[in-house]
């Protein structure tokens, strides 16, 4: 990826990076492990973002 990227693209990439986290432990505990996986998790190599 280019070093000099448009600011809007940088914001989108940062938002995607923040969203790409695991389910918090307190949520797993609160739901008695009914919610463990996070359906919108994205692997950087398998699924690419729309840019």
From Swiss-Prot:
GO terms for biological process: translation. The keyword Cytoplasm does not apply. Keywords: Ribonucleoprotein, Ribosomal protein. One of its GO terms (molecular function) is structural constituent of ribosome. One of its GO terms (cellular component) is cytosolic large ribosomal subunit. Gene3D superfamilies: Ribosomal protein L39e. PROSITE patterns: RIBOSOMAL_L39E (PS00051). It holds the Pfam family Ribosomal_L39. Part of the 50S ribosomal subunit. Belongs to the eukaryotic ribosomal protein eL39 family. This is Large ribosomal subunit protein eL39.
């Amino acid at each position: 990826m280019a070093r000099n990227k448009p600011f809007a693209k940088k914001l989108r990439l940062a938002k995607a990076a923040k969203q790409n986290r695991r389910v918090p432990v307190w949520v797993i505990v609160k739901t008695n492990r009914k919610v463990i996986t996070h359906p919108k998790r994205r692997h950087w190599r398998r699924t690419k973002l729309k840019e």
